[in-house]
Amino acid sequence: MAIGMSELKKGLKIELGGVPYRIVEYQHVKPGKGAAFVRAKIKSFLDGKVIEKTFHAGDKCEEPNLVEKTMQYLYHDGDTYQFMDIESYEQIALNDSQVGEASKWMLDGMQVQVLLHNDKAISVDVPQVVALKIVETAPNFKGDTSSASKKPATLETGAVVQVPFHVLEGETIKVNTETEEYLEKVK
């Protein structure tokens, strides 16, 4: 199905030249003279590169043949990540470039969304909020009560996030995986 210029928005998936892209950023421009156009930054699902593309009135792009499947992350071995389809129990292996930034939020057994393009896995999406245990952070000191102050904390997946001073090593916290921000302690 063709997608018109007026339908473009952030997060929309499109296909150009047989390559699937996600719109990362877009701006609708109405110049004083001439027709309006959309300037967009689009990210390739295949290689992760971001390019800038201009769409003019009347331009159309195709909706990619993408399927999202819920899969279970099993384990990481070298530069490959193993996943299992929770419906068919079929296992697939993805490399570092296909998993990308999602790897720093994935725990063994976690359910993730794997994106397939023409039946080939191309990317992994983790939940927007994950609960992870802090394995290393600086201890608290008397007087560290300013709510605006933060300290780095290493999570069980190896990711490092900034947390308030009252958060201690060994505690489990919720983190927004898109902004990489601390949300709250898990009770």
Curated annotation (Swiss-Prot):
InterPro entries: Elong-fact-P_C (IPR015365), NA-bd_OB-fold (IPR012340), Rib_uL2_dom2 (IPR014722), Transl_elong_fac_P/YeiP (IPR020599), Transl_elong_KOW-like (IPR013185), Transl_elong_P/YeiP_cen (IPR001059), Transl_elong_P/YeiP_CS (IPR013852), Transl_elongation_fac_P (IPR011768). Pathway: Protein biosynthesis; polypeptide chain elongation. Its main location: cytoplasm. One of its GO terms (biological process) is peptide biosynthetic process. Keywords: Cytoplasm, Elongation factor, Protein biosynthesis. SMART domains: EFP (SM01185), Elong-fact-P_C (SM00841). GO terms for cellular component: cytoplasm. GO terms for molecular function: translation elongation factor activity. It is found in: Cytoplasm. PANTHER family: ELONGATION FACTOR P (PTHR30053), ELONGATION FACTOR P (EF-P) FAMILY PROTEIN (PTHR30053:SF12). HAMAP family: EF_P. Involved in peptide bond synthesis. Stimulates efficient translation and peptide-bond synthesis on native or reconstituted 70S ribosomes in vitro. Probably functions indirectly by altering the affinity of the ribosome for aminoacyl-tRNA, thus increasing their reactivity as acceptors for peptidyl transferase. Belongs to the elongation factor P family. This is Elongation factor P.
